[in-house]
Structures are given as C-alpha cells and as structure tokens.
C-alpha cells in the first residue's frame, strides 16, 4: 500500500451507463493494488477516437472508460517490484478501459488501476499532459508497423534501404506517431492528409504529402513510389481509405494494415495484397471481453512482442527521439472527458490530441 487513504474506496470517474453511453460518477470504486496491479493518481488523461466509439454493446454499466493516462504511483501490489515500479514513480500507460473483465480499471478516473507491466516511466523533461498523449499511439503503431506489416527494420536497428511506406491519415495522432517511427527505422514516410496539414506532417518527418480528396491521389502515390510501394498503414479505415491504399500499392502487391476492421469487399479486389487489422490491447496479454470482432483470448506471443516494444518506446522517450501529437489541453478535470468524446464524434477535432488535466 502507499499514500492513498485506506478508508477512501470510491472516486470520481467516467463510467458506462445503462443506455449504452457514459456518464460522470462520483462513487466509482477505487481499484485495489494487489499482485502486479498498481494504483496511479492521475494527473492528465487523453481522449482517443476509440474512447468515443465505445458505445452500445461495447459499454459495460459501471465500468470505467479510457485508455491513456499519466500520473504518480500511490499504491503497489506485491509483484510490482519485478517490473521496477514503486510508489512515487511518474508513469503513463495505455490500458484497456471499458473492460468488462476488469471494470474498475480505466484511465478516466482519479485513481487508475493498471498492471505494472503496462507502465512507461515518464522522464523528468516530459510533462504529464504530453505523457498522457503518447502510449496508445506509439504502442499501437509499433504493433501495426513492426509486427503486422513486418517492416524489415526497427527504430533501434534501422533499415539499410529507405523503402517507402504509406501512412493514410498522417495528420491523426497515430499518423504522426507512425511517421516518426518510420523515420527512426530508416523508412521513407509517404503520407495522405488534407492540404492544410501538409506543414504539420512534414514537421514530423513525412517525405511527401498527398491530398486524399484528390481523385488522382493513388496515381500520384504510385508515381512517387515508382509503382513499387509494398506497405500501407491505414489510420482512418473506411471504404475510401482502403481503396486509395490498395490502388497506391505497387503491381507486386504487398501488405496493408488497418486500425479497425476493414471492408472485406475492398480486400477482395486485390488478392495479391495481404490485409490485416490490429488493436493495441492485445499487447497486454489479457483476455479481451469486448464483442466480436474485437473480443479474443490472450495471446502470449503478442504479449511478449508488446513488452519488447514497450521497452523500445521507453528508450526512445528517454532519449527524446519521439514527441506527442499537437495537444489541445483542457482544465476542468474528468467532466471535460465527455465533452471531448462528443467533439470527436461530431468530427469537430482535427490535428489535435484532446488532453484533460485532472489537477490544477
């Protein structure tokens, strides 16, 4: 145990309700520190599109939502020490919020329960607000780029050949994370976004930018890559995005990875392309209790990959080699989380990562 008052076992949190949505609760349970579980006093949280999409059958009444948080460890279970986590550590993580199997664990709470193996330590030079915006993006991109797409390089062991890799939706938070990781790994990021985001994505390392609204977008990418593009990461994942990615990939085919289930009808148009989609929580090594197609049993191999990749993210962060997406930081605590979700659903958020400060 740590400094958290033992008598206090309830807290304010954003939880699922009986209508398939979320609400602010002031009597949510505080997680218990046991085994490898630690309790973190949250200082900042970020709101991702996946949080906003958690509606309907994905909602468990009373379960705490949210994936990304940053804060200070206040309690530790007995097994936390083997992951070098102790009370007082500044940490951030991507966890599985709105989890029917661990309903008391979610980022959108005053005190967050998390498995110690999921935690990334925050360097002294990185703020809580910045740290809260890092883990979901960089963890998921690592899975997509270096496991699913099987890129022949790594940020700590760069490719000797600067192969082009398409990032569709480069102005998203996952997009700018992917661009940075590709550059570090020795690849050439070729990116789609709206023209008003060209300067943004080039500041993160994009080699070339293409307007996905342009009917000739795919043809322009094929020309840029000399009809030899072999890898595409789709950060948007809808029919249009997949069609452009498929049309941009070269004559020899290649690999396409999405961040949501992709349209099978588009996949059928070019069987020479290997399509896949990923979700970050598989790297936690836990059963996922969400409905199909997201629910699944724990995969030990993906957990091992996740632990290796988390160590890479920690090293890149310690060395100052990665940075967060541009932030829109809000005061007002957890009440702003629901506002941020609604803004994302209404497509009022562009080029910014929504971060909510929990302390003044």
Curated annotation (Swiss-Prot):
Task: Keyword check for NADP, yes or no.
Answer: yes
What is the main EC category here? Answer: oxidoreductase
The cross-references to SUPFAM superfamilies, in alphabetical order and at most eight, read: GroES-like (SSF50129), NAD(P)-binding Rossmann-fold domains (SSF51735)
Subunit text: Monomer.
Q: Which family does it belong to?
A: Belongs to the zinc-containing alcohol dehydrogenase family.
What is the stated purpose of this protein? Trans-enoyl reductase; part of the gene cluster that mediates the biosynthesis of pyrrolocin, a bright yellow trans-fused decalin-containing tetramic acid with antimicrobial activity. The PKS module of prlS together with the enoylreductase prlC catalyze the formation of the polyketide unit which is then conjugated to L-serine by the condensation domain of the prlS NRPS module. Diels-Alderase gNR600 is involved in endo-selective Diels-Alder cycloaddition to form the decalin ring. Subsequent methylation is carried leads to pyrrolocin A.
Query: By its UniProt entry, which Pfam families does this protein fall under?
Result: ADH_N (PF08240), ADH_zinc_N (PF00107)
The protein depicted here goes by the name: Trans-enoyl reductase prlC
Which InterPro entries does the UniProt record give?
ADH-like_C, ADH-like_N, GroES-like_sf, NAD(P)-bd_dom_sf, PKS_ER, Trans-enoyl_RdTase-like
Q: Which UniProt keywords apply?
A: NADP, Nucleotide-binding, Oxidoreductase
This enzyme's EC code(s): 1.-.-.-
Indicate which residues the UniProt annotation says bind NADP(+): 50-53, 171-174, 194-197, 212, 259-260, 349-350
Disulfide bond residue pairs: none
Query: Which residues does the record give as substrate binding sites?
Result: 136-143, 280-284
- The gene for this chain is prlC
UniProt-listed SMART domains: PKS_ER
Question: Which GO terms label this protein's molecular function in UniProt?
Answer: nucleotide binding; oxidoreductase activity, acting on NAD(P)H
**UniProt pathway annotation:** Mycotoxin biosynthesis
What domain of life? Eukaryota
